[in-house]
């Protein structure tokens, strides 16, 4: 593909060392030591230069066949059972919530010994004063029901009448019925809730669906990869953008569609060799971790299997089995008491993939994408928007210290295309707690840490690029990348926070995700460094800082050829990236240094270039907007 070229100048791993690298460690280099490498790291050359319209890329697929299946937990490498348990937020194992008078927030959340799964929420208010006024004090308690069915009953009493809302849901669906009962009348009739109540009955829609993602079903049929002249790709996104036309996309996709068909057949043989049934249903278990599995992952997971494969290799099935019904229970809690970020969530729902056919209302297909964010309250939501709302509201309820941060909507939306909303919720939890720790917290601490690690990697691996991007808006180099991040991180932080969704073309982003959920966060660092390496010549040729920003912002959007890009990412003589162990060590080192100098940073003007949730929630809700503001000031 145009834009992806090989560079003749390769950095010398042994001799290069940045003179004043604040994160340098004599025993730790981004070019990992031999003893740190796994056997699979030595067998990756076979994915290089093999992506063409032949069967050459399949030549190595017969090696290292595993004749046994490991459980998800045993395939999590060093992930221990204790570490897996740590992903589950302990306060929600079971809780009682009390709301006191004149207090809109829960006054206390007390843990209980009962598990939260297969529980039912019961809201009651038996106390009424003599003036026929509602008391605002009520209790929400979670109790274990005798069956697998989840029943939620909400009752609010008012002297001679009470309003009750009963919701019964099975494993597959939920049906909500609201009735009002008067003790002096035998008939039941539908009614609106008194406006003084803490919530309205018609807003308590606790239905949860368990259907799989729309793409999983769509991509099972025959001729699913067949090229078409439609303006939409197989995932429902627009083919064309400002960097390539529909014709250019179709020219690339023709050979790539045959590659997808061929790889799917190789995957079916791979699953069959491991005793996994793929004929009657999409597999929920996959081959154990090995050099061969890694090669298959890096060559791309078939779209039909993609959601289940992500869920399996990330440990999602373990969490789901240990916490059945937790998602549904938390959603019901969110119905009763909306999380503090609910307004932000509602605002971003209709900005999530407005050009994707699965997220757009049918009446809007002929409108401009800018109109997609405008939504009428009278117009019913499309199913994907309703699912996205439930996932994000439940996530904000489950992790209140994390809450909601813009870019989580794109992560959740991508998950929902390939899996059920319950699995999408757990994948969002795993991503934020395991793969990108503290990345989306209120102060974006994880984003700052990872950007420090990335900048250190650029400084060591790409000194020519570093000399151009290390300048602040005044043209002064940034030396201490822990105390003060270069302004360019306003761009690269968005890469990490979205895991390249909306940054790279759809197919390329999906291929990065295949590797990301199998190998860990090191894949994001490899991807970022590869992008900067590809644009090194353009970056060095720009004299103005604003031009450098524009080049880096536009670089990933043109990387349509997923095969060519992934092959370069994993090419040994093209990259100098850290191993996962190196990343964890450097994250820990940066975190310690940031903690030790936190008080100084608060008193220093240098902290203005550190990322924070407050600085990222502004006009258009995108971190790139802040970059544009800086660029305007500098011109």
From Swiss-Prot:
A single cellular component GO annotation: cytoplasm
Transmembrane region(s): 410-430, 485-505, 512-532
Modified sites of kind Phosphothreonine: 193
Entry annotated with the keyword Transmembrane helix: yes
Assigned keywords, A-Z: Cytoplasm, GTPase activation, Membrane, Phosphoprotein, Transmembrane, Transmembrane helix
Residues annotated with Phosphoserine modification: 191
Molecular functions per Gene Ontology: GTPase activator activity
Positions of region (Disordered): 361-381, 581-621
Cited Pfam families: RabGAP-TBC
Membrane topology: Multi-pass membrane protein
Keyword Transmembrane carried by entry: yes
Rab-GAP TBC domain segment(s): 300-520
Biological process terms in GO annotation: actin cytoskeleton organization; exocytosis
Domain of life: Eukaryota
Function summary: Regulates exocytosis by functioning as a GAP for ypt2.
Protein name: GTPase-activating protein gyp3
Taxonomic classification: Eukaryota, Fungi, Dikarya, Ascomycota, Taphrinomycotina
Name of the gene: gyp3
